[in-house]
Amino acid sequence: MTSYFKMLAGSVSAVLIGVSSSNAQGRLSEGDIIKSLAGSAQAARAADLNTDALRRDVEKRIQVEGTENAASPPPALQALAKMPNLTVQIQFDFDSDWIRPASWETIGVIADALHHPLLLSNKFIVVGHTDAKGKRAYNLKLSQRRADAVRDMLVSTFRIEPGRLVAVGLGEEQLQDQNNPNAGVNRRVQFLNIGPR
């Protein structure tokens, strides 16, 4: 690892768990992350997205029966799907927002990409998603805690400016595999480029 942040993630991992910092999830490259998150005119138009309103819309939605796994999500969620994004599997302890050491290197590589000049002037939403196990209201809160945990690690450990990251939990409201709502692929974290800050 040549980058400062990859070395920091590896050092933290090795010190705390006493093993190599290799990542069982497979390796993300900084270049692939930059390519996925590179800004576009669409991202710039999305910069005025109101994340507080998005949270309120999702909270209202989970109160309504029959909206689980709905084929047509609300417009705000449809807009998120069109933004430059990166989806990663971040491992958490069960029913917890504690990030497992196996994912620290992944977060370090993401931090390297966010420090790259092509992305440095942009703002991002860190979106937490869950599967459909459990109650929707609980999953919404858990996904928010997990998105907050990833954001906090990027800020405190990898020195990403706090104003560049907004954490939003969507619970099970945007399943990646709607045919298998309890599948592990639905438990994920997304990074969305919402344009210049």
Located regions from the model:
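Periplasmic peptidoglycan-binding/anchoring modules of Gram-negative envelope and division proteins
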Residues: A71, A76, A81, N85, ...
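N-terminal targeting leaders that direct proteins to extracytoplasmic destinations
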Residues: T2-A81
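Generic structural signal for beta-strand residues in well-ordered domains
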Residues: M7, I17, P117-L119, F158-I160, ...
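Generic anion/oxyanion-binding catalytic loop in active/binding sites
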Residues: S13, S96, H115, R136, ...
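Periplasmic OmpA-like peptidoglycan-binding domain that tethers envelope proteins to the cell wall
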Residues: H129-R197
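Short coil/turn segments at secondary-structure junctions
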Residues: I90-W98, K133-Y138
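Extracytoplasmic/secreted proteins, especially bacterial periplasmic and envelope-associated proteins
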Residues: D32, L49, A53, D57, ...
